[in-house]
């Protein structure tokens, strides 16, 4: 049986200058990262990390610190499949030799964590990889990048952490049984990102319920709840029907905003049909939630960028090709704020209305349980045939 530590134990270890091991969800990377506080970096800690990890040492920083230190993205289009935000690599400009030694890397890591460091103190490129953590931490993105800044901040230190993936002697990634043995051998605390999410949920609130009212629709009467996110400032809406707190799984649709499909009835996508069908199914069941997530227009690229992508699609590109040609991610959505709204409404386990497996994984990463994926019907016609085919063949949607 795997023995995980508590987040409080991990915080105490980090504050004492010791590393911890953090593992993410089995549906995500399913990897364990060695993490310690950047401001407490020593040559010994870096050497230990190099010995037992891939050696690709990263330093997770807040968005503000990345901007203050003039750390631009490694590439203008982030095509990393997990959305890890790699910045241009750095070394210390002074006080180092080649930059690759444990002592040299410990020095630049401490510089990155020091609020008095200026852009001129850093040389580019270098041997340490800064990562840009999402504002809101693991409540916005359940990655090791955000776990590193969250744990150091919660420990009372600067929100800057050092991280690298633990590997076996043969170079394969350590999974939970390997991580458990490693932690036992080296007396390290092992925690999960899911537990960090739950800890922050217990101690912090990231969404605010602003207003509630009755909303009569052609599908029946819903209770409409309006929320504002603390970090994204977007205004999200949940249509609620029935009692959500009776212990049964809740039928849920987490719907991404789509002005063209939801409001104007565009035939280029199936968004409007999915929204209407979700409301109908929840009303038929008499219990459930239709969550309308703002800021997801065009899979997160925004309305005007979506219209630019439409221009390219009119010239023969598919929806994936168009985004990439514009230098935009294929899918920039995160479900952290939406998951917090569902949690605040009382949802703990759900039957999720979606054809997109990534949406299921996105919500489960925030401590919600999806017991069943409920497929939504698909209507193919000449205007959306290629779009649906691309979603199925290139984005992994389950369209039957």
Swiss-Prot record:
Enzyme active site: 331 (proton acceptor), 333 (nucleophile)
Positions of Mg(2+) 1 binding: 29
Lineage: Bacteria, Bacillati, Actinomycetota, Actinomycetes, Micromonosporales
Organism of this sequence: Salinispora tropica (strain ATCC BAA-916 / DSM 44818 / JCM 13857 / NBRC 105044 / CNB-440)
Binding site for GTP: 253-257, 274, 297-299, 319, 354, 359
Residues that hold Mg(2+) 2 according to the record: 29, 144
Site (Essential for DHBP synthase activity): 127, 165
Protein EC: 4.1.99.12, 3.5.4.25
Protein name (record): Riboflavin biosynthesis protein RibBA
